[in-house]
Amino acid sequence: MKVSLGNGEMGVSAHLQPCKAGTTRFFTSNTHSSVVLQGFDQLRIEGLLCDVTLVPGDGDEIFPVHRAMMASASDYFKAMFTGGMKEQDLMCIKLHGVNKVGLKKIIDFIYTAKLSLNMDNLQDTLEAASFLQILPVLDFCKVFLISGVSLDNCVEVGRIANTYNLIEVDKYVNNFILKNFPALLSTGEFLKLPFERLAFVLSSNSLKHCTELELFKAACRWLRLEDPRMDYAAKLMKNIRFPLMTPQDLINYVQTVDFMRTDNTCVNLLLEASNYQMMPYMQPVMQSDRTAIRSDSTHLVTLGGVLRQQLVVSKELRMYDERAQEWRSLAPMDAPRYQHGIAVIGNFLYVVGGQSNYDTKGKTAVDTVFRFDPRYNKWMQVASLNEKRTFFHLSALKGHLYAVGGRSAAGELATVECYNPRMNEWSYVAKMSEPHYGHAGTVYGGLMYISGGITHDTFQNELMCFDTDTDKWTQKAPMTTVRGLHCMCTVGDKLYVIGGNHFRGTSDYDDVLSCEYYSPTLDQWTPIAAMLRGQSDVGVAVFENKIYVVGGYSWNNRCMVEIVQKYDPEKDEWHKVFDLPESLGGIRACTLTVFPPEENPGSPSRESPLSAPSDHS
């Protein structure tokens, strides 16, 4: 039953059901608050029941108001009128921190809940809202500023944000400038940037679509506008990534600038760039803010593998674009690889050993090693292994690579090799007590851990730990399940072992779906949720604290798979998230910071300054 009473704004209506006598009902008016507000505003306009007069600091105009209204909307006025201050008993109060325009805006808002803003009244309104602690007005001012940011006013909006400590607006302005910096350079507004904001922009990994040379020239323009700005030259130049410029650009455009030759800090920056470029093999262990890729785009990356159809080995390097939910290609390897080892040092991707041809016995193992540089989307060859090896594990630890075990035409391997980027050479370290292949490994706490694998055709459950400082192997608590061709990774203080296969009975292989993690502190294994589907000989990577298991081979289904499964350690849950472009076994995966997908890494602006041979000769 619908009941309606009255007309107009004060009318009410409700849908009622018959009820027993004595039942209590509650009613709410949707219009009462606005009617009361309108009533108070009319009283103010007519000067009725006003009990205090406010006077702005910049004039004598008076604003009669009601103390209760002002105190209900502002902590400032509440403290003034109830906190025992002298103004509590005054009938006329001068507000020295607020001007006429700002005070009128605040009073109108308190009485009407409405606010009109433009660039002419914004700062007066902001100043009054900040002084009088009117938070809704501050929020409206922030929205107004953010919604109107453009190339023509971004510098001014940034100044206002800094003046009034509008953190959200300041962050938005920074992001706007970073996204539109090339366009801003072509306007006069660029030269109005304050030093602090320009330095932030030039230091940011989110700055896109500009070469380091273009950034250097822009910084020089800004410095030369006014003589006092030259005092900032050294501080500004520290944000330019000179090591990433070509030697030709350094000579032709940078060294010809006077302060780059006379200022000690700038001279040292050029020396740093020169030293960096002369040591191409050492670069992964020479990384700094000025040598890092100018990108904030980190992605899951996969490399190589053997195709399900025709058993062709892939040389593809791909990254997964999470936003577009699709795979994108990076520069492929010169030669295909599977059963290889990959590891990352200083955001350089190393690809070690493996096989170029499909061969389950490892007789076509190779010893070659290549390094991918995402800054230029290019590969270069580095020193080869001392031994050919496949089905092995590769770890990056303390700026070195460690290639552990594996197999080759000579048989199963127990040897371990260490690559030193500073010397560009491999050397032997302490070998394992027994040969292993198909094992997995990870690093934690400055130590390398190796689990499972196959020794003399027998699947293992042992866990071994290698200390690079003492060059010794030690035995740890074994896994609860024997397994090989599995994967291993570290999340937090836990070492996860996932998937793989082992013998079912005496001769047939079977997927291992069970998973477990090892606690180095407790020397103890704990089971976790089982995989949804079997995967052996996979790629594994930790991305945003989730474990991604990529591709591989399913022994239960007797085929390569394209599935990518994600494990959430916090929830102890597995999910199928997406697929590879094709089914690939013996694939490898990692995370790498690369240029955003919309950029073309192969453009001339990505010319590599490397002086090392790039023809693999």
Curated annotation (Swiss-Prot):
Annotated region described as Disordered, given as residue ranges: 595-617
Residue span(s) of domain BTB: 50-119
Kelch repeats: 300-347, 348-399, 400-446, 448-493, 495-545, 546-595
Pathway membership: Protein modification; protein ubiquitination
Record-level Gene Ontology MF annotations: cullin family protein binding
Gene3D superfamilies associated with the record: 1.25.40.420, Kelch-type beta propeller, Potassium Channel Kv1.1, Chain A
BP term (GO), one: protein ubiquitination
Domain BACK residue range list: 154-255
Keywords tagged on the record: Cell cycle, Cell division, Kelch repeat, Mitosis, Repeat, Ubl conjugation pathway
Top-rank taxon: Eukaryota
GO CC annotation: Cul3-RING ubiquitin ligase complex; midbody
Subunit structure as annotated in this protein's UniProt entry: Component of the BCR(KLHL9-KLHL13) E3 ubiquitin ligase complex, at least composed of CUL3, KLHL9, KLHL13 and RBX1. Interacts with AURKB.
Physiological role: Substrate-specific adapter of a BCR (BTB-CUL3-RBX1) E3 ubiquitin-protein ligase complex required for mitotic progression and cytokinesis. The BCR(KLHL9-KLHL13) E3 ubiquitin ligase complex mediates the ubiquitination of AURKB and controls the dynamic behavior of AURKB on mitotic chromosomes and thereby coordinates faithful mitotic progression and completion of cytokinesis.
Record's protein name: Kelch-like protein 9
Native source organism of the sequence: Bos taurus
Gene: KLHL9
